[in-house]
Amino acid sequence: MAAPEPARAAPPPPPPPPPPPGADRVVKAVPFPPTHRLTSEEVFDLDGIPRVDVLKNHLVKEGRVDEEIALRIINEGAAILRREKTMIEVEAPITVCGDIHGQFFDLMKLFEVGGSPANTRYLFLGDYVDRGYFSIECVLYLWVLKILYPSTLFLLRGNHECRHLTEYFTFKQECKIKYSERVYEACMEAFDSLPLAALLNQQFLCVHGGLSPEIHTLDDIRRLDRFKEPPAFGPMCDLLWSDPSEDFGNEKSQEHFSHNTVRGCSYFYNYPAVCEFLQNNNLLSIIRAHEAQDAGYRMYRKSQTTGFPSLITIFSAPNYLDVYNNKAAVLKYENNVMNIRQFNCSPHPYWLPNFMDVFTWSLPFVGEKVTEMLVNVLSICSDDELMTEGEDQFDGSAAARKEIIRNKIRAIGKMARVFSVLREESESVLTLKGLTPTGMLPSGVLAGGRQTLQSATVEAIEAEKAIRGFSPPHRICSFEEAKGLDRINERMPPRKDAVQQDGFNSLNTAHATENHGTGNHTAQ
């Protein structure tokens, strides 16, 4: 009789399934962004109409769409914009909105305050991108709304809707990180199609920046060729870049235009210039954006003939850059009554500056420890050890050999100080980087240590006085302080053809002198 076979061991249990994405997150309240990109079938219905709620819910979770879908949205929206006039005409009731600057989650709040785009007419005054870290989400969502509501939602061009600024600030980098350069180029083509101005109710001129000494009538705007990159000077540039003078309504000089020293291009226009333009064109007021406002809006001096504010600035990005601590506002105009609705900022996901990843963020800590080890290794050499092993080496001088090693120790010590400052003062470094246009600190700040960082200046003379005294433990606590620190970013960035720009500045000043005198205006 055969012996019974030994019992076989039971097979090991299958491994547990991997945890769902985000299950191991430290902050459980922050959901993991969707990894799935929306497809054409999910974004568009069978008739090719965008499902705006599906897109909105996905973007709010930091989700993305297929690149081809992003291109389709951008191109379809651009086709609608190309059919519009350079100066569109819109009717009340309407809600007018100012700068958005990539603050997508605040844009969602704006629509809560202003009303659903399905039954509310909207006019946006430009600057949808740059500075904020959700610019492409703003573009995709607004372009989908334009596709859905082409006759009730209107988009104007701001000074940031151009290649020059989006390359200099954050939008191009954001497009390349989240999508591709193809998406960025499609956005630039779409931006070239945006109208430059709107005539609201035959009463208000709506524009991003303001007036130009070369624009006297509304027909001058209508005749402009807008399908191009905005030039560094001229009427198109002025519509996007000009500002009211600081002493608007209380001018010491009656000259209408002076060189805009804050922007480094275009002009300041004053109260008499606005009143003359309004009277010549039978208008009530000019509504513009382009400047952050503590309350989200500003009403300027009233016209002596109509009793209505001659100029209104509206700004719709609350707590701009996460440091201004300002309110945002939208302007609702209905039945000849104008109402301002303010709102505060909404919570939003955090991005490190310039879309830095956590590994790059951790490098200062690693670098500090490595340099500490190198310093300790080199520092153990005694004078006796330095004297040994061939004094004839290094030009035959032991002193030269010792000096070479000491120089290495000093160099590594300098590196250690840089990494130490980066780690210990990371919050201040981030703040300074966020307030400089290139996202980079001034040369030598970190190597000089904490004291140098305290007295760091940004890249232009105009910002020096504002940022002097900025110390690492200090938090920006007022609107005016943030505006002063950020002033360098209000300038037109330097162009590759810098020589031509110098000529343009002289030409602009000469043009203002020839046509309007030489009024001097103090910049904000």
Swiss-Prot record:
Miscellaneous comment in the UniProt entry for this protein: Unlike for protein substrates, PPP3CB activity towards synthetic phosphatase substrate p-nitrophenyl phosphate (pNPP) is increased in presence of the immunosuppressant complex FKBP12-FK506.
Chief localisation class: cytoplasm
Q: Which residues cross the membrane?
A: none
The record lists the effect of residue 422 to A as: Modest increase in catalytic activity in absence of calmodulin. Does not affect interaction with calmodulin
Residues covered by region (Calmodulin-binding): 401-415
Q: Enumerate the residue ranges of region (Disordered).
A: 1-25
Q: What class of enzyme is it?
A: hydrolase
Location relative to the cell: Cytoplasm
Cofactor annotation remark: Binds 1 Fe(3+) ion per subunit.
Instruction: Report quaternary structure and partners.
Output: Forms a complex composed of a calmodulin-dependent catalytic subunit (also known as calcineurin A) and a regulatory Ca(2+)-binding subunit (also known as calcineurin B). There are three catalytic subunits, each encoded by a separate gene (PPP3CA, PPP3CB, and PPP3CC) and two regulatory subunits which are also encoded by separate genes (PPP3R1 and PPP3R2). In response to an increase in Ca(2+) intracellular levels, forms a complex composed of PPP3CB/calcineurin A, calcineurin B and calmodulin. Interacts (via calcineurin B binding domain) with regulatory subunit PPP3R1/calcineurin B.
Task: Indicate which residues the UniProt annotation says bind Fe cation.
Answer: 99, 101, 127
Protein family according to the UniProt entry: Belongs to the PPP phosphatase family. PP-2B subfamily.
Q: What is this protein's function per UniProt?
A: Calcium-dependent, calmodulin-stimulated protein phosphatase which plays an essential role in the transduction of intracellular Ca(2+)-mediated signals. Dephosphorylates TFEB in response to lysosomal Ca(2+) release, resulting in TFEB nuclear translocation and stimulation of lysosomal biogenesis. Dephosphorylates and activates transcription factor NFATC1. Dephosphorylates and inactivates transcription factor ELK1. Dephosphorylates DARPP32. Negatively regulates MAP3K14/NIK signaling via inhibition of nuclear translocation of the transcription factors RELA and RELB.
Cofactor list: Fe(3+); Zn(2+)
* Chain positions covered by the region annotation Catalytic: 65-356
Q: How is its activity regulated?
A: Activated by Ca(2+)-bound calmodulin following an increase in intracellular Ca(2+). At low Ca(2+) concentrations, the catalytic subunit (also known as calcineurin A) is inactive and is bound to the regulatory subunit (also known as calcineurin B) in which only two high-affinity binding sites are occupied by Ca(2+).
Q: Compositionally biased, Pro residues: which spans?
A: 9-22
Q: What is this protein called?
A: Serine/threonine-protein phosphatase 2B catalytic subunit beta isoform
| Entries under InterPro entries matching the protein | Calcineurin-like_PHP_ApaH, Metallo-depent_PP-like, MPP_PP2B, PP2B, Ser/Thr-sp_prot-phosphatase
Residues the record lists as Phosphoserine modifications: 478
Question: What reaction gets catalysed by this protein?
Answer: O-phospho-L-seryl-[protein] + H2O = L-seryl-[protein] + phosphate; O-phospho-L-threonyl-[protein] + H2O = L-threonyl-[protein] + phosphate
Q: Where is the active site?
A: 160 (proton donor)
| UniProt-listed Enzyme Commission number(s) | 3.1.3.16
**Impact after mutating residue 418 to A:** Does not affect catalytic activity in absence of calmodulin. Does not affect interaction with calmodulin
**Annotated region (Calcineurin B binding), positions in chain:** 357-379
